[in-house]
Amino acid sequence: MPGKPVNLASPNERKLNFWERLYLPAVVQGLAYTWRKMRSPRYTFQYPDELWYPPDSYRGRPVLVEENGRPRCVACGLCARACPPLAISMQAKEVDDVKEREPAWFEINMLRCIYCGYCEEVCPEEAIVMSKEYDLTFQSRDEAIFGLEKLLVPAERLKDRLEWLDRYKDPQYGQHWEFRKENNLHSLKDRPFLKWLLEEEGMEELKSTHLRPEEPVAAERSWGGVRAEG
């Protein structure tokens, strides 16, 4: 014998009247809400005639900072190692400069990039940053692979993002550590300091080891560390 249907309605549940069973009040309420929203300010843009300008914290496509006509990047490879979708690849080359290395070629596959910003977080030179560019179109897969010619952007155009990074880093570390540029005196970001050493101190050449002692420090001697020569 099939079971009898069970009424699951609560005994205290209010029964709908005739108009409510027709759902007309709900329809009128929906139309009234739509009419109110039609008269409120619009949130949409008439793209492409009107463009949206993102805030400084926006994570658009990653770009490389170009400083004095050269990439700030030292080709350390940290961004490529930190990239979750493995979208970044590069090859380093030696250069006659205080930074010693820069990328011979640098590529980002924009079809793989997820705009997470990890590359920007780990970069010790602030050489790769997230721009405000969000409108990307490609006609083929080859066009989606950006090389140095598409990635390099002058530092002046990225001033807002670089200043935002300086404000952003301090609160991240809280009371444990304060981000200071002078902690990185050997890096490309501190060219004024290096120029001062060359001109004021009369140094004919600047070695990458000039800011540290030639002999191993106490912490290195404890495990037998030896400084490599030149």
Swiss-Prot record:
Membrane topology classification: Peripheral membrane protein
Show the catalytic activity.
a quinone + NADH + 5 H(+)(in) = a quinol + NAD(+) + 4 H(+)(out)
Q: Which domain of life is it from?
A: Bacteria
The EC number(s) given in the record are: 7.1.1.-
Q: Which InterPro entries match?
A: 4Fe4S_Fe-S-bd, 4Fe4S_Fe_S_CS, NADH_quinone_OxRdtase_chainI
* Cofactor(s) the protein requires to work: [4Fe-4S] cluster
Q: What is the lineage of its organism?
A: Bacteria, Pseudomonadati, Rhodothermota, Rhodothermia, Rhodothermales
Q: Entry's PROSITE patterns?
A: 4FE4S_FER_1 (PS00198), 4FE4S_FER_2 (PS51379)
Q: Which organism is it from?
A: Rhodothermus marinus (Rhodothermus obamensis)
The residues listed in the UniProt record as binding [4Fe-4S] cluster 1, with positions renumbered to this chain, are 73, 76, 79, 123
Principal localization reads membrane
**ATP-binding keyword on record:** no
Q: Name one GO cellular component term.
A: plasma membrane
Family according to the record: Belongs to the complex I 23 kDa subunit family.
Function description: NDH-1 shuttles electrons from NADH, via FMN and iron-sulfur (Fe-S) centers, to quinones in the respiratory chain. The immediate electron acceptor for the enzyme in this species is believed to be menaquinone. Couples the redox reaction to proton translocation (for every two electrons transferred, four hydrogen ions are translocated across the cytoplasmic membrane), and thus conserves the redox energy in a proton gradient.
Q: Which enzyme class, named as a word?
A: translocase
The answer to whether the entry has keyword 4Fe-4S is yes
As to how many cofactors bind and how, the note says: Binds 2 [4Fe-4S] clusters per subunit.
Q: How does it assemble?
A: NDH-1 is composed of 14 different subunits. Subunits Nqo7-14 constitute the membrane sector of the complex.
Pfam families in the cross-refs? Fer4_7
The protein's name: NADH-quinone oxidoreductase subunit 9
Q: Where in the cell is it found?
A: Cell inner membrane
Start and end of every 4Fe-4S ferredoxin-type domain?
60-93, 104-133
Instruction: Output the Gene Ontology terms for molecular function.
Output: 4 iron, 4 sulfur cluster binding; iron ion binding; NADH:ubiquinone reductase (non-electrogenic) activity; quinone binding
Q: Which residues take part in binding [4Fe-4S] cluster 2? A: 83, 113, 116, 119
Annotated keywords: 4Fe-4S, Cell inner membrane, Cell membrane, Iron, Iron-sulfur, Membrane, Metal-binding, NAD, Quinone, Repeat, Translocase
